[in-house]
Amino acid sequence: MRPRMKYSNSKISPAKFSSTAGEALVPPCKIRRSQQKTKEFCHVYCMRLRSGLTIRKETSYFRKEPTKRYSLKSGTKHEENFSAYPRDSRKRSLLGSIQAFAASVDTLSIQGTSLLTQSPASLSTYNDQSVSFVLENGCYVINVDDSGKDQEQDQVLLRYYESPCPASQSGDGVDGKKLMVNMSPIKDTDIWLHANDKDYSVELQRGDVSPPEQAFFVLHKKSSDFVSFECKNLPGTYIGVKDNQLALVEEKDESCNNIMFKLSKI
């Protein structure tokens, strides 16, 4: 006789079958992402001087908005930052922009002084006489004369530096230091006003690389309209007016009219 084989028929209940089938039919969570938008971030750095001048620097970079995603297991939300640069490099770029701003303020270092800013202006005396620069025989000479209302005034380019001299209480300095200027005719900015300490005159000299110490003058703000220029190399000596000419004047009384000048923007 052949051996009789036994077969087991295991039955699954309809309820259990429907539950297992339901689990198989549940679709997995899909990753959903919100629309990414690129934004531009701009950092503005400002330095306001006591003299009223404002130094402004802007730096900008691009970054994308945070993007949402869903976890496959827990279904919880996560946020990821997508930017133009990784986080570390973004920090480095921001630090670099700050350093670039500091470098822009200290772009030109001349004999231990740092250029802050520069601007053109017309220069006139206390008695409304204009300071002009006339080309004679291939060289510029300085004239001080009366100018008509309709006559165009010459301009000078003033370069502002931080002076090592401590500032007074008159508010003519920045960060506890006085301001110092170097002046050139706007017609030729390679020429500087130069204090000749031998014959106490003011001359125009052309330089090759950087201005000498005789070309720097400490700026004193006398009022809202007038300033005076003290020679850096000759403390107590100012640019003044003598016989309708610019000259060096030793003046103990800083309120003397012949050392006061008016700077006007045209």
From Swiss-Prot:
Give the record's keywords alphabetically: Chromosome, Cytokine, Cytoplasm, Cytoplasmic vesicle, Nucleus, Secreted, Transcription
- Which Gene3D superfamilies does the entry mention? 2.80.10.50
Q: Where is this region: Homeodomain-like HTH domain?
A: 1-67
- Which residues, in ranges, are excised as the propeptide? 1-101
Q: Which GO terms describe its biological process?
A: antibacterial innate immune response; defense response to virus; extrinsic apoptotic signaling pathway; gene expression; interleukin-33-mediated signaling pathway; macrophage activation involved in immune response; macrophage differentiation; microglial cell activation involved in immune response
Q: Which InterPro entries match?
A: IL-33, IL33_C
What broad class describes the main subcellular location of this protein?
nucleus
According to its UniProt entry, what is the function of this protein? Cytokine that binds to and signals through the IL1RL1/ST2 receptor which in turn activates NF-kappa-B and MAPK signaling pathways in target cells. Involved in the maturation of Th2 cells inducing the secretion of T-helper type 2-associated cytokines. Also involved in activation of mast cells, basophils, eosinophils and natural killer cells. Acts as an enhancer of polarization of alternatively activated macrophages. Acts as a chemoattractant for Th2 cells, and may function as an 'alarmin', that amplifies immune responses during tissue injury.
**Could you give the subunit structure recorded for this chain?**
(Microbial infection) Interacts (in reduced form) with H.polygyrus ARI; the interaction abolishes the interaction with its primary receptor IL1RL1. Forms a 1:1:1 heterotrimeric complex with its primary high-affinity receptor IL1RL1 and the coreceptor IL1RAP. Interacts with cargo receptor TMED10; the interaction mediates the translocation from the cytoplasm into the ERGIC (endoplasmic reticulum-Golgi intermediate compartment) and thereby secretion.
Name of the molecule in the record: Interleukin-33
Q: Source species, please? A: Mus musculus (Mouse)
**UniProt gene name:** Il33
